[in-house]
A protein has these predicted regions:
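Extracytoplasmic cell-surface/polysaccharide-interacting catalytic and binding patches
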Residues: 1-52, 142-150
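Amphipathic alpha-helical interface surfaces
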Residues: 43-47, 70, 86, 97, ...
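Short, surface-exposed glycine/acidic/tryptophan-bearing loops
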Residues: 68-88
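A residue-level signal for beta-strand positions that form part of recognition/binding surfaces
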Residues: 58, 87, 130
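Extended, low-complexity, intrinsically disordered C-terminal regulatory tails
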Residues: 46-75
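Catalytic cores and adjacent binding grooves of peptidoglycan-active enzymes
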Residues: 79, 84, 92-150
């Protein structure tokens, strides 16, 4: 697996987009294929780095790529974009920040045509917030937005 910075997304590495505490804890492999690495590069270049540049602050990724066994272990959907390296769950310090990040992606679509497949603002019952952003590698993005509480 590549470990360095992602070309065109200088604040992100392949290692951080493939990191999984669940995989580590359960001894599961979370090594991506070349296709997944290519998708992660697109994710970082089109979505994560522009978000970082716009807000000028560190963007913390809770989860991006998940190998099938890792996805199953975390209770992920069997059709999750995480399996292809086309999704990231971005940690947000507050609901306000989560909404600001979501608005950023919506504005980028409206102004620049950079579409997304899913944009889910989520909150755990314990109070943590994250924003899930995904894209379709075929460009068939549904622009699906949803708010969820776990």
């Amino acid at each position: 697996m590549k470990h360095g910075m992602i070309s065109g997304a200088t604040n992100f590495t392949y290692a951080e987009l493939c990191r999984s505490t669940t995989a580590d804890a359960k001894g599961l492999s979370n090594n991506p294929t070349d296709e997944v690495l290519s998708n992660l590069k697109t994710l970082a270049q089109r979505y994560l780095q522009p978000l970082r540049d716009h807000f000028g602050c560190q963007i913390i990724i809770n989860s991006a790529y998940r190998a099938p066994m890792v996805n199953k272990a975390v209770g992920g959907a069997p059709t999750s974009w995480h399996l292809k390296g086309c999704a990231a769950d971005i940690r947000c310090p507050s609901a306000y920040v989560a909404v600001q990040y979501a608005n950023f992606f919506i504005d980028r679509f409206e102004k620049h045509g950079v579409g997304f497949d899913e944009l889910f603002l989520s909150r755990s019952r314990k109070g943590g917030y994250w924003l899930h952003v995904s894209y379709s590698p075929t460009g068939d993005n549904r622009l699906r937005c949803q708010v969820m509480v776990y």
